[in-house]
Amino acid sequence: MGKPLQVGVISLFPEMFSAVTDYGVTGRAIKEGLLTVSVWNPRDFTHDRHRTVDDRPYGGGPGMLMMVQPLVDAINAAKQSLGEDTPVIYLSPQGQKLDHSGVQHLSGNDRMILIAGRYEGIDERVIKQYVDAEWSIGDYVLSGGELPAMVLIDAVSRLIPGVLGHQDSAAEDSFASGLLDCPHYTRPETYNEQQVPPVLLSGDHEKIRRWRLQQSLGKTWLQRPELIHSLALTDEQETLLNEFIAQQSSGE
């Protein structure tokens, strides 16, 4: 077994991360020693009786900002635990958009500290002095960085060897090949007069492989055509995609 992925999280709502630590794939990874998740609450590093972590922004404007001192002290505490050279990531709408390539890049780390902001964000001086990278999960605004942090943890954890039940599961996920996943079916064979495609019941592994590849190509062409344009398709993929497009045009 390799070194576990060690994740430190800076958050005002540590309890939210029980969704990661107690359930599903990530919860199992923690139980098996493949992943650790520790949370530091900036409120624990305040020095006033109100445990103040936010204040009004200079220059005016709506909302509040997370203050420097509690946030920096929480980051330093996380670094003391995980290592001073642990990269610090801020989950932010201004960050680089997280995709499969980004997840693969992040999976090369065995430690990381994630800052889950709240209110209108965090003081820019924290970003400039302590943050190594900013990542976003999409072009929209959430109430805080906790959900994006959990998304990142879940996505990266899936690439840790041994986390998924089947060794090929991560390799066959959507986007691992640059394509969307093919359709999947389980029992019963017929439901509401809809039948499982006969090829999946044939037992012919080569035909099944080609069908799945063609369906994956076709779904990507229909739903995310920009992904197709960014790929250098093999001769087989070109042939299968052209067959799929012809079938669509003929209404099959």
Curated annotation (Swiss-Prot):
A biological-process GO annotation: tRNA N1-guanine methylation
Residue numbers binding S-adenosyl-L-methionine: G117, I137, G138, D139, Y140, V141, L142
Gene3D superfamilies: 3.40.1280.10, tRNA(m1g37)methyltransferase, domain 2
InterPro entries listed in its UniProt record: Alpha/beta_knot_MTases (IPR029028), tRNA_m1G_MeTrfase_C_sf (IPR023148), tRNA_m1G_MeTrfase_TrmD (IPR002649), tRNA_m1G_MTases_N (IPR029026), tRNA_MeTrfase_TRMD/TRM10 (IPR016009)
Compartment(s) where it occurs, according to its Swiss-Prot or TrEMBL record: Cytoplasm
Single GO term (MF): tRNA (guanine(37)-N1)-methyltransferase activity
Keyword check for Cell membrane: no
One Pfam family recorded for the sequence: tRNA_m1G_MT
EC numbers for this chain: 2.1.1.228
CDD domains in UniProt: TrmD-like (cd18080)
Superkingdom of origin organism: Bacteria
Coarse class of the protein's main subcellular location: cytoplasm
Catalysis: reaction(s): guanosine(37) in tRNA + S-adenosyl-L-methionine = N(1)-methylguanosine(37) in tRNA + S-adenosyl-L-homocysteine + H(+)
Record carries keyword Transmembrane helix: no
GO cellular component: cytosol
Keyword vocabulary terms for this entry: Cytoplasm, Methyltransferase, S-adenosyl-L-methionine, Transferase, tRNA processing
SUPFAM superfamilies: alpha/beta knot
Family of this protein: Belongs to the RNA methyltransferase TrmD family.
Assembly and binders: Homodimer.
Described function: Specifically methylates guanosine-37 in various tRNAs.
HAMAP family per UniProt: TrmD
Official protein name in the record: tRNA (guanine-N(1)-)-methyltransferase
Species of provenance: Idiomarina loihiensis (strain ATCC BAA-735 / DSM 15497 / L2-TR)
Primary gene name: trmD
